[in-house]
Amino acid sequence: MQRVQENPDYTAWAQPVFPGIALIHLSAHGKAACLEEAAPVSADVLEIFHCREGRMELNIGGEYCYVSPGDLLIARARKIASEVCFPLRHYHGLIVRVDVQQTPHCLSCILQDVNVQPQLIAKRFCSRREYFIVRSNPSFEHIFSEMYAIPDAIKEGFAKIKVLELMLFLSVFDTQEAEWSRLSLPPSQVHLAKSVAAYQLDHMGERYTLNQVAKEFGVSCTCIKNSFKAVYGVSFYAFIKARKMEYAAYMLEHTDKPVVEIAGEHGYDNSSKFASAFRSVKGVSPGTYRQQNQKNYPA
């Protein structure tokens, strides 16, 4: 497997599968990443994204599109902006990259009853629209679930089988009957959600309500709720709690501050309520988390 791109927040690994087809593994724990180093060279490239964990934002032809766990997004690579964002700062997924000009006309000619033609798949999904999103589908989910843990001893052969299986399902997938979900937002709505998220970060140690934030931005509560849910995939209050607990976890790992002090810095004047909130997000108490993860200071 070839490492395509790596930095502290983002890693992409590419595995050649067939001529013109590669399987790219993505892992991210940051806000955004630029895919220029992993960008396809051909103008006629189809990219099939699958999200396993987290959430990804893509700008496709000027529209902001979002994929969540189980979603499948198909688009022509030339329409996708090089920078992708991860609203939850956490993402794991795959891209099947298909260079239509370099792939054989028929990938499965050795199998008489299997007719897989990448050119026809590209036409099926991206001839009328810039992209196509399939919500969590059991058939596709089964195929991708096995792609994430391929044993090294059979990696090359197994990847070929799974990609061929994916292409076969895409070849017969009924795009007319399937519910087509754009999952796209206008830039103004995306900007509002991200501005509110930045406001939350600047006021980490304060307690505030949705109504107060709505007044601060001069919009309705409903507008913020809808924008926030669309961009981040969670509610306004769930995002606040999750982000506070992530920052609290970082402080538990990298500082020797008492738990009660960390709780206060994140808007909790009651350490028991803080511990309960922390456990609901991280699965363990703050004290246990520190014992298991502390890096710079003795327990």
What positions do the PLM features span?
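Key DNA-contact positions within bacterial/archaeal DNA-binding proteins
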Residues: T222, S272, G287
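Core residues of bacterial helix-turn-helix
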Residues: E216-F217, H266-G267, F278
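Terminal helix-turn-helix DNA-binding modules in bacterial transcription factors
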Residues: K194-D202, R207-Q212, A230-S272, Q291-A299
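Helix-turn-helix
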Residues: Q212-C221
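Short hydrophobic/aromatic patch on the recognition helix
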Residues: I224, F228, K273-F274, F278
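A long, hydrophobic alpha-helical segment
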Residues: S139-I154
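Short, Lys/Arg-enriched, Trp-marked, Pro/Gly-tolerant hinge/linker segments that flank
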Residues: Q119-R135, D152-F158, M167-A198, D202, ...
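N-terminal regulatory/effector-sensing and dimerization cores
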Residues: Q2-P118
